UniProtKB/Swiss-Prot annotation:
Belongs to the connexin family. Alpha-type (group II) subfamily. Its main location: membrane. This is Gap junction alpha-6 protein. GO terms for biological process: cell communication. The keyword Transmembrane helix applies. InterPro entries: Connexin, Connexin_CCC, Connexin_CS, Connexin_N, Connexin_N_sf. The gene is Gja6. Keywords: Cell junction, Cell membrane, Gap junction, Membrane, Transmembrane, Transmembrane helix. It comes from Mus musculus. Residues 1-23, 100-150, 232-283 are cytoplasmic. One gap junction consists of a cluster of closely packed pairs of transmembrane channels, the connexons, through which materials of low MW diffuse from one cell to a neighboring cell. The keyword RNA-binding does not apply. Gene3D superfamilies: Gap junction channel protein cysteine-rich domain. A connexon is composed of a hexamer of connexins. The chain crosses the membrane at residues 24-41, 77-99, 151-173, 209-231.
Length: 283
């Protein structure tokens, strides 16, 4: 659990395609969660079961009481939380790489059409088709990526699910443990012969870490909500600006938004019609 380098490298690759809020969220996730989990927190819980003692000699009673007191370790719960909140942003990164790869194919098709020698109007129509595909995917020239179209929807979905997972794990922790640990745990589970007292190791230190991780989770959740509203506001603003620009579409050339699978007809050197299919480039 102490080696998080692979996850950190993947999250670092997301930063160029994220907003300022997304970059801050990644820093908070790595510095205040992953780094702390791999060092101080894991060592603080290393003796969790070994130092859990009950004032009874009944065989099996201590193990049953420990299992009832800690259905899942705090450390393992936080590890699951880190994994779950990281998955949506990694899926967004996969979509970014897909768009970049497909954008290269579109650019290649565009170069081939420009180099072809046939009707100029047909070439212009085909180039507009490619431009429409690039716009829907959120891609631009030279394999650059702009957050728009389906890529923007993927990013907004990743933020939404991150916030859902953050809140879900906060509620799970509150339901199972609360946010403090007491030095004394009273157990009445079978096969204990009577009501027994069990004692936890370093409850104050662990309570401090629990509260710290709670604050970090709340901060991450707030960052997700702020970023979601920011991206939504920018998307609505751009949509309104686009609606205003459509007034001038009669005078200015506007890219055509066509379906993701369009069959084109080109003319080769012998003036024979050749069908060319633009494959779907977005998911």
């Amino acid at each position: 659990m102490s080696d998080w380098s692979a996850l950190h490298q993947l999250l670092e690759k997301v930063q160029p395609y994220s907003t300022a809020g997304g970059k801050v969220w990644i820093k908070v996730l790595f510095i205040f969660r992953i780094l702390l989990l791999g060092t101080a927190i894991e060592s603080a819980w290393s003796d969790e079961q070994f130092e859990f003692h009950c004032n009874t000699q009944q065989p099996g009673c201590e193990n049953v009481c420990y299992d009832h007191a800690f259905p899942i370790s705090h450390v393992r719960l936080w590890v699951l939380q880190v994994i779950f909140v990281s998955v949506p942003i990694l899926l967004y990164l996969a979509h970014v790489y897909y768009v970049v790869r497909q954008n290269k194919k579109l650019n290649k098709q565009e170069e081939e059409l420009e180099a072809a020698h046939f009707n100029e109007a047909s070439v212009e129509r085909h180039l507009e088709t490619i431009a429409g595909e690039q716009f829907k995917c959120g891609s631009e020239e030279q394999s650059k990526v702009k957050m728009r179209g389906r890529l923007l929807l993927t990013y907004m979905a990743s933020i939404f699910f991150k916030s859902v997972f953050e809140m879900a794990f906060l509620l799970i922790q509150w339901y199972i443990y609360g946010f403090t640990l007491s030095a004394l745990y009273i157990c009445e589970q079978s096969p204990c012969p009577r009501r027994v007292d069990c004692f936890l190791s370093r409850p104050t230190e662990k309570t401090i870490f629990i509260l710290f991780m709670f604050v970090v989770s709340v901060v991450s959740f707030v960052l997700d909500i702020i970023e979601l509203f920011y991206v939504l506001f920018k998307a609505i603003k751009n949509r309104m600006r686009k609606a205003e620009d459509e007034v001038y579409c009669d005078e200015l050339p506007c890219p055509s938004h066509v379906s993701s699978s369009t069959v084109l007809t080109t003319i080769d050197s012998s003036e024979q019609a050749v069908p060319v299919e633009l494959s779907s480039v977005c998911i």
